[in-house]
């Protein structure tokens, strides 16, 4: 088998700044440069680099200024080099992926690409950037998409004239690590709600374009609610929430259960309903192990173990473990009776009380005794009746014991 190995020296990947350039960098830019260079050298050592440790690395490890020469990027002078480096990289990848070719056990070093910084010089950057960029034609400081490489070569002259406009933020490119970092850290956070995202932007100076996930989170601050319901006047921050709310007025239920055909207005409600058919109970009680189909049911159940009563009546101070119990209790203070019988007009504070009352009109008796078959309107009446049978059975057993002893 043929093993393809690409020799790389530190000279091929070094990045340099003159003394004047270094002083013009901000502390954050210097720290970014230091991190990139130290990681680059670490990558070279991990793939077999055996040369002596360069002076620039020694300086950076001591947090000193790395003045290593006048040229900012030896061997790189124009945008055409970006195209050349990327072509070489793709050729190497194609060679390694060709059938019959064995890949060396040593990981190939990350290549470096070139980019103009705010001072008109060229600096090197880890090619994690190229994982999302197939050609430099689609990537340039001004954010303009170019269809052909010749357009890019001509465009870089105009770009050089607009350095201040292109780099209004005056920041270096950020080193990219797509997805989660090895320690599980979420790299970017929203300043409004502190929610973190796993996708990093490629360019720090184009936050609204390159960091799409973070931008979508920031584009509507939580204080703004531009989507207003014409039916009830309720306002929402995001259009998706507004659309879901409108279904409460229109009665639309686009999510149907494939097992029983029941439809729901929200997908999350359908998922909860489907657990009835599948028998899945993913939420277990931490104390007794009892499982529930919904997380809220587990939370309510666990309060029976902890004794927590978070819902307090503002009128009398009585507390409850569930919010529904508090809502029922409040109606005692307000005198509200929203449930009205359509037969006799009698009103009730709870729907369950109305259902019980409704059976007096319909004659329905759903609770039957297993001993004698007698039926009742309400379950408490059945419980009282069953105690009669229990006492009779106990008395009969006592008589049998007495007769047996004699």
UniProtKB/Swiss-Prot annotation:
Under SMART domains, the record lists: KRAB (SM00349), ZnF_C2H2 (SM00355)
Its domain of life? Eukaryota
GO cellular component, as recorded: nucleus
Instruction: Mention one GO biological process in which this protein takes part, according to its record.
Output: regulation of transcription by RNA polymerase II
Q: Where in the cell?
A: Nucleus
| Gene3D superfamilies named in the record | 6.10.140.140, Classic Zinc Finger (3.30.160.60)
Q: What are the protein's UniProt keywords? A: DNA-binding, Metal-binding, Nucleus, Repeat, Transcription, Transcription regulation, Zinc, Zinc-finger
> Which terms in the Gene Ontology molecular function aspect does this entry carry?
DNA-binding transcription factor activity, RNA polymerase II-specific; RNA polymerase II cis-regulatory region sequence-specific DNA binding; zinc ion binding
Q: Where are the zinc fingers (C2H2-type)?
A: 227-249, 255-277, 283-305, 311-333, 339-361, 367-389
Domain KRAB residues, every copy:
8-79
Principal location class? nucleus
User: What are the TM regions of this chain, as residue ranges?
Assistant: none
Query: InterPro entries this protein is in?
Result: KRAB (IPR001909), KRAB_dom_sf (IPR036051), Znf_C2H2_sf (IPR036236), Znf_C2H2_type (IPR013087)
Under the heading Pfam families, the entry gives: KRAB, zf-C2H2
**Function recorded in the entry:** May be involved in transcriptional regulation.
Q: Which family does it belong to?
A: Belongs to the krueppel C2H2-type zinc-finger protein family.
Query: What is this protein called in UniProt?
Result: Zinc finger protein 793
- Which organism is the protein's source? Homo sapiens (Human)
């Amino acid at each position: 088998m043929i093993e393809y190995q690409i020799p790389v020296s530190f000279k091929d990947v070094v990045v340099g700044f003159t003394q004047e350039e270094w002083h013009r960098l901000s502390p954050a830019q210097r720290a970014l440069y230091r991190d990139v260079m130290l990681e680059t050298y670490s990558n070279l050592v991990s793939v077999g680099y055996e040369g002596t440790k360069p002076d620039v690395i020694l300086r950076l490890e001591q947090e000193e200024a790395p003045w290593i020469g006048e040229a900012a990027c030896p061997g790189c002078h124009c945008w055409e080099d970006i195209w050349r480096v990327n072509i070489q990289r793709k050729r190497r990848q194609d060679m390694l992926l060709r059938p019959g070719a064995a890949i060396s056990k040593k990981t190939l070093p990350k290549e470096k690409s070139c980019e103009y910084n705010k001072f008109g010089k060229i600096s090197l950057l880890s090619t994690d950037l190229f994982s999302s960029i197939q050609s430099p034609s689609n990537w340039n400081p001004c954010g303009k998409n170019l269809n052909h490489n010749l357009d890019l070569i001509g465009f870089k002259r105009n770009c050089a004239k607009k350095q201040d406009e292109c780099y209004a933020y005056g920041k270096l490119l950020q080193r990219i690590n797509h997805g989660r970092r090895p320690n599980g850290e979420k790299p970017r956070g929203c300043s409004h709600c502190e929610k973190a995202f796993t996708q990093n932007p490629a360019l720090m100076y184009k936050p609204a374009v390159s960091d799409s996930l973070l931008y979508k989170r920031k584009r509507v601050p939580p204080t703004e609610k531009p989507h207003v319901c014409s039916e009830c006047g309720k306002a929402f921050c995001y259009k998706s929430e507004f659309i879901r709310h409108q279904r409460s007025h229109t009665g639309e239920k686009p999510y149907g259960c494939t097992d029983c055909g029941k439809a729901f207005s929200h997908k999350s409600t359908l998922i909860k309903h489907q657990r009835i058919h599948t028998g899945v109970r993913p939420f277990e009680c931490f104390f007794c192990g009892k499982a529930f189909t919904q997380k809220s049911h587990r939370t309510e159940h666990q309060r029976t173990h902890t004794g927590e009563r978070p819902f307090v009546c503002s009128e009398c101070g009585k507390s409850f473990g569930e919010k529904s119990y508090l809502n029922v209790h409040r109606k005692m203070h307000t005198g509200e009776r929203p449930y009205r019988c359509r037969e006799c007009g009698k009103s009730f504070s709870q729907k369950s009380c109305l259902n019980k009352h409704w059976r007096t009109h319909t004659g329905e008796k759903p609770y039957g005794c297993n001993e004698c078959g007698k039926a009742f309107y309400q379950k408490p009446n059945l419980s009282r009746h069953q105690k009669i049978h229990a006492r009779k059975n106990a008395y009969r057993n006592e008589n049998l014991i007495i007769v047996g002893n004699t």
